[in-house]
């Protein structure tokens, strides 16, 4: 009863017109290229396996083994499927029922990542030694190797459920990147200019006839032939994402942490609705209750499925919340609502 009274008071404080929130991204949809499955049943099974990788942030087979041990029927979670043509390639597009799947994954201890996904900004420099180095951008590329690298990044982003983005350079950017100034850091400049939750600076350099070297945040330990370059980047980016997305499960018998979440920056009832909607999307939160509220701020007591790190990883990709401060002594996380 007290909780209901608090909510009613809060609604009166934040009176405003009701508005609809934005649609959620296609978290429970998976697309499998036609050359990666033999028949529809095989495609549906592979789509489910890819969904588990997407939801857990992990490529570990142990989560699939748990599903097998629990004797969950993968096909039962399929809501719909169809084939579609993307570019010149046909895909099996599968949509899964998240409402029925998520509780089952919780039961078998699968760590999950919600709808908020990180943006990884990539500054990618290619130096062939024949002309001035070039930086890959989000625009189309006529060079075959550059086009293959960009397609590989696009496929990985789709598979892992993250955003792997290349900058869109304006004329000022191009002039700065092409200047020969040892005091200018292209990496620092691009990282500060464009939004990102994580940043990779990569340099691909030709060091001989059909020999390439990779430097920067991703490094090759030996020269690569051109035909090996794409496979190297696929493996290296996947390994980077393994570390970035990993949600460590609790020790057997351990309980999830409790965290006070304080959200400031609310202006009206529409903001309150948006906050509630955004919190509903966060898989790290098991339950929440109102602790205190003011006109522009709400405090929630949250019970997590895992540790606060899992919550922080989800919030890192949020477009609605900005992490301001975490106080370990009071176990309080302060967020700014971005409206």
Regions found by a protein language model. Give the residues of each.
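A short, hydrophobic beta-strand-centered structural micro-motif
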Residues: 73-82, 123, 163-170, 177-211, ...
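N-terminal segment of the mature soluble domain
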Residues: 44-66, 118-181, 194, 275-301, ...
């Amino acid at each position: 009863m007290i909780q209901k009274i608090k909510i009613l008071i809060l609604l009166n404080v934040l009176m405003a017109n009701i508005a609809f929130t934005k649609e959620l991204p296609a978290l429970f949809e998976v697309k499998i290229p036609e050359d990666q499955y033999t028949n529809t049943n095989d495609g549906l099974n592979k789509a489910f396996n890819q969904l588990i990788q997407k939801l857990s942030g992990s490529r570990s087979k142990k989560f699939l083994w748990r599903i097998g041990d629990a004797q969950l029927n993968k096909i039962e979670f399929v809501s719909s499927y169809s084939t579609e043509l993307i570019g010149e390639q046909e895909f099996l597009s599968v949509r899964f029922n998240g409402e029925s799947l998520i509780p089952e994954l919780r039961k078998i201890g699968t760590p999950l990542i919600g709808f908020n996904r990180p943006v990884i900004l990539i500054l990618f420099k290619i130096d062939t030694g024949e002309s001035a180095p070039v930086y890959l951008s989000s625009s189309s590329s006529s060079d075959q190797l550059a086009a293959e690298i960009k397609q590989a990044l696009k496929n990985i982003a789709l598979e892992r459920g993250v955003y792997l983005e290349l900058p869109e350079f304006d004329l000022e950017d191009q002039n700065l990147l092409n200047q020969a100034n040892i005091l200018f850091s292209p990496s620092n400049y691009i990282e500060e200019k464009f939004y990102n939750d994580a940043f990779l600076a990569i340099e691909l350099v030709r060091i001989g006839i059909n020999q390439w070297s990779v430097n920067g945040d991703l490094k090759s330990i030996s020269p690569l032939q051109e035909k090996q370059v794409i496979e190297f980047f696929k493996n290296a980016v996947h390994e980077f994402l393994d570390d970035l997305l990993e949600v460590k499960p609790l020790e057997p018998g351990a309980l999830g942490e409790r965290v006070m979440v304080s959200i400031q920056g609310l202006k009206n009832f529409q903001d309150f609705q948006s906050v509630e909607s955004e919190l509903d999307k966060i898989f790290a939160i098991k339950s929440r209750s109102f602790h205190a509220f003011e006109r522009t701020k709400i405090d929630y007591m949250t019970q997590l499925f895992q540790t606060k790190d899992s919550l922080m990883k989800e919030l890192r990709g949020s477009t609605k919340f900005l992490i301001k401060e975490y106080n370990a002594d009071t176990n309080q996380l302060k967020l700014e609502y971005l409206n």
